[in-house]
């Protein structure tokens, strides 16, 4: 379940002490939370039949926003991969590997939801 995975990974990431890069880590946590909310809102839109019109009326630039979210995911994937390469702490390695897997799952879910909306 990606919801519990999100909560677990965010909690573990927030407990990490990466020295000077803690600002980077906080930024990653914030972006992960933002992506989770976006994924959830797309999922809700898909569950409501014909909600594409509602989505378009609330957010005329939803396709542009979707593209931006995919860029954010790709950037986060690169950041997580970089952190994974430089850390030697096994707890951090496991956490970043799970975060990477979660990002790939979320990317796939957002892609699936967006195809259902088009």
UniProtKB/Swiss-Prot annotation:
Function according to Swiss-Prot or TrEMBL: Mediates the nuclear export of encapsidated genomic RNAs (ribonucleoproteins, RNPs). Acts as an adapter between viral RNPs complexes and the nuclear export machinery of the cell. Possesses no intrinsic RNA-binding activity, but includes a C-terminal M1-binding domain. This domain is believed to allow recognition of RNPs to which the M1 protein is bound.
Key word Transport present: yes
Motif residue range(s): Nuclear export signal: 9-18, 82-91
Lineage: Viruses, Riboviria, Orthornavirae, Negarnaviricota, Polyploviricotina
Subcellular location field: Virion; Host nucleus
InterPro entries associated with the record: Flu_NS2
Disulphides: none
Protein keywords: Host nucleus, Host-virus interaction, Transport, Virion
Annotated source species: Influenza A virus (strain A/Chicken/Japan/1924 H7N7)
Miscellaneous comment in the UniProt entry for this protein: Average number present in a viral particle is estimated to be 130-200 molecules.
SUPFAM superfamilies named in the record: Nonstructural protein ns2, Nep, M1-binding domain
Subunit structure comment from the entry: Binds M1 protein. May interact with human nucleoporin RAB/HRB and exportin XPO1/CRM1.
Similarity comment text for this entry: Belongs to the influenza viruses NEP family.
Any one Gene Ontology BP term: exit of virus from host cell nucleus through nuclear pore
Protein name, UniProt field: Nuclear export protein
Any one cellular-component term (Gene Ontology): host cell nucleus
């Amino acid at each position: 379940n990606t919801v519990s995975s999100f909560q677990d990974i965010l909690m573990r990431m927030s407990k990490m002490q990466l020295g000077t890069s803690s600002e980077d880590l906080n930024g990653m946590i914030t972006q992960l939370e933002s992506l989770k909310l976006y994924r959830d809102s797309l999922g809700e839109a898909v569950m409501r039949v014909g909600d594409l019109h509602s989505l378009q009326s609330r957010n005329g630039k939803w396709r542009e926003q979707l593209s931006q979210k995919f860029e954010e995911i790709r950037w986060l994937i690169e950041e997580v991969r970089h952190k994974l390469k430089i850390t030697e702490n096994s707890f951090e390695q496991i956490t970043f590997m799970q975060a990477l897997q979660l990002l790939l799952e979320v990317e796939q879910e957002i892609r699936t939801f967006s195809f259902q909306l088009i």
